[in-house]
Amino acid sequence: MLFATLEHILTHISFSTISIVITIHLITLLVRELGGLRDSSEKGMIATFFCITGFLVSRWASSGHFPLSNLYESLIFLSWALYILHMIPKIQNSKNDLSTITTPSTILTQGFATSGLLTEMHQSTILVPALQSQWLMMHVSMMLLSYATLLCGSLLSAALLMIRFRKNLDFFSKKKKNVLLKTFFFNEIEYFYAKRSALKSTFFPLFPNYYKYQLIERLDSWSYRVISLGFTLLTIGILCGAVWANEAWGSYWNWDPKETWAFITWTIFAIYLHSRTNPNWKGTKSAFVASIGFLIIWICYFGINLLGIGLHSYGSFTLPI
C-alpha cells in the first residue's frame, strides 16, 4: 500500500511539473525578454526526472522485478529515457537542441501512460513464466532506449524537411526592435541573436536564407548522431532478444509480428545510415528515410499491443471508452 501511494504521488507530481515546464519552455522560445525562465524549466525537468526515477525504483522494490512487464511501465520507462536524452547535451555543456523534441515527447508519452490507459494497467502484476528471466531488463530496456533515441532522431529529420521545404522562413518579427522569434525551434534563438548582433553593422541581404541553411545543417548533424546511437541500441536489443528467445522458446528467431516489425525498423534505419555514405543523399533525402522510421517505430511499439497477438502480446491492452 505504501509503495502504491508513493507511485501515485510521484507520477502525478512529475506529470504536473512537466506540463508547467513545457509551457515555460514555449514562452521562453517565443519571447526573449523572458529568457530568465529557462533556468526554471530546466530545474523542473530535473525534478521530474527524479520523480520518474523514484517511481521506477519504487515499482521495482514492490514487484521484485524490473518494471517493464506491461505497456504502462514501458511507457513510463520510455519517458524516463527521453529525460536522459534531454540531459545529455547539458552534461556536455552544449546547447540543448533536443529540448523542443524531448520535452513535448515526454509529456505526451507520460500523459498517455497516466491518463490514456485503464487503471488496471497501472497495477504491478506477477510476471508470466516466459518473462521471468535476467534478460528482461537487458532486452526490453535496450529496445525502449533505442525507441526513444530513434524517435528523437526521426523528429529532427522531420523538422529538417519542414524547414527545407518552407518557402518563407521568417525568423524574426519586424514589429519589434528587440526581435521576437516567430518560428520557435530547438533553442536556436540564442544562436540567432548572437549572429544577428555580430552582423548588425554589416550588409547581409541573404540573412534569412543563411540562417535557414545553418539550421538545416545543424539539424542534419544532430539527427545523424542521435540515430546512430539509437541504431546501435536497437541492434543490441535485438541480439539480446534473440538469445532470450532461444532460451525461452528454443529458437533465435520466429518471425513473430513484433520480431518482424523490429527487423523492418532496423532495416529502415540501416538504409538511412547507409545513405549517409553517399554525399548526394545527405540532408533532405536521408531525412525523408528517417522520417518514415518515425511511423515504423510506433507501429513496432504499439502494433502488437493493439492486436494482442504473437509471442510478444503480454503487454496488450484495451483503450478506455
Swiss-Prot record:
Keywords: Chloroplast, Cytochrome c-type biogenesis, Membrane, Plastid, Thylakoid, Transmembrane, Transmembrane helix. The chain crosses the membrane at residues 9-29, 44-64, 68-88, 143-163, 226-246, 260-274, 289-309. Its main location: plastid. One of its GO terms (biological process) is cytochrome complex assembly. GO terms for molecular function: heme binding. It holds the Pfam family Cytochrom_C_asm. Belongs to the CcmF/CycK/Ccl1/NrfE/CcsA family. This is Cytochrome c biogenesis protein CcsA. It comes from Oryza sativa subsp. indica. The lineage of its organism: Eukaryota, Viridiplantae, Streptophyta, Embryophyta, Tracheophyta.
